[in-house]
Amino acid sequence: MEEFQGYLELDRSQQHDFLYPLIFREYIYALAHDRGLNRSVLLDNVGYDKKSSLLIIKRLISRMYQQNHFLISVNDSNQNRFLGYNKNLYSQMISEVFAVIVEIPFSLRLVSSLEETEIVKSYNLRSIHSIFPFFEDKFPHLNYASDVLIPYPIHLEILVQNLRYCVKDPSSLHLLRLFLHEYYNWNSLITPQKSIFAKSNPRLFLLLYNSYVCEYESILLFLRNQSNHLRLTSSGIFFERICFYEKIKYPVEEVLANDFPATLWFFKDPFMQYVRYRGKSILASKETPLLMNKWKYYLVNFWQCNFYVWSQPGRIHINQLSKHSLDFLGYLSSIRPNISVVRSQLLENSFLMDNAMKKLDTLVPIIPMIGSLAKVKFCNTLGHPISKSTWADSSDSDIIDRFVRIGGNLFHYYSGSSKKKSLYRIKYILRLSCVKTLARKHKSTVRTFLKRLGPKLLDEFFTEEEQIFSLLFPRASSILKRFYRGRIWYLDILCINDLVNHE
């Protein structure tokens, strides 16, 4: 970061705070390639590792210096005049560089804010699992929740315009607009199949989408704070307002009995709990469904008026937490009553009291999990394990290590599940799939293969959790059995990778 800031200060003194000339600097491409701006971003390196070289970078920069390559030919719209024959490679390189350049104002602002407030960086706050303790603390006291899918912008121009508040260089925005116009399907709707979370050029589109969501949430937070401020306003203001308009027609006692509570209830906005991960968010409240419906239609109008995004109100469902589950971050979360019986002794009489408390219940969605395993050929659609034929050419240790790593990651992430029964079923599928893969490699049956190598072949599947729990508790069988049933949230999980990434 210090080296990056040194380069940036040199360019600032020469270019008057313009970010546009940075695209012609070779070190920017090196920073984009090495992810020197933020090495903690856990994204797959799908770029140009084996193809990038200084010669390719120089060739690309020389092409960008020629002005005729920036001209868009209306007649020859199918011809890529700028990138030439290396369209995919050059497009990937420019996309990564654009992401680095646009991240500069955000990164410098973050560094300055940390230095001013002297905040110690806590990477645990970035963990995905940190959301679930918030659920356990807040959601048992709430009644209704709404799943909200943040709509994708129908035009990439909306994403570019959101950057104009942070990126003050118009040339950089114009160049970004030109790049997206010529090398991406500019006027098409961003569909889930071609979403911004696709594995091609993820960094730039994640930055554009996050800026879009950031502006949406900043406006939403401002309005929510205004509603809370209105909620704390003295009730005398509303009382005087009601009396001013109604004292001629009705006596004061009738106003107090009828109109005043209703009007005060109308102005009092509920305290909303808001949680988001990527494009999915949850709004939860303790109030009535009527006020939740008001928030729903407000969000729809808010998207249409501010971001020109059309959304159907019927796609936002309001569910009662005690009767429905929330599908969020791979868990099925619901609120269930936890009844405990307490014996009370009063002089010579004793009686039992049922104490009902609400508790957050987190379950593993077994059917989608089996579907994911079937998609990557660990089992069929019914959940019966099958051999992984594409791994049969690897060594035995490599095959076992892959299966153990996938099983360990799944157990690590779903350690917060209230019930581990379905999770052990997933582990059974992986174990038997591993044995069938090894038996296929050695051209043998599963029974004869296990007899020949013994039961110690798959001990790593059992010792994986013991190694994790031994770091937290003493190694004792009774303690381990007790905590296997409990749930533990880990604060070191920064991203979710699907099983396809393990190929």
From Swiss-Prot:
Gene Ontology biological process terms in this record: mRNA processing; RNA splicing; tRNA processing
- Subcellular locations according to the entry: Plastid, Chloroplast
Q: What GO molecular function annotation could you give as one example from this UniProt entry?
A: RNA binding
> What InterPro entries does the record tag this protein with?
Domain_X, Maturase_MatK, Maturase_MatK_N
Q: What keywords are assigned to this protein?
A: Chloroplast, mRNA processing, Plastid, RNA-binding, tRNA processing
Q: Name one Pfam family in it.
A: Intron_maturas2
Q: Which PANTHER family would you find in this protein's record?
A: MATURASE K (PTHR34811:SF1)
Which HAMAP family does its entry note? MatK
Q: Which family does it belong to?
A: Belongs to the intron maturase 2 family. MatK subfamily.
What is the protein named?
Maturase K
- Organism this protein belongs to: Rubus ursinus
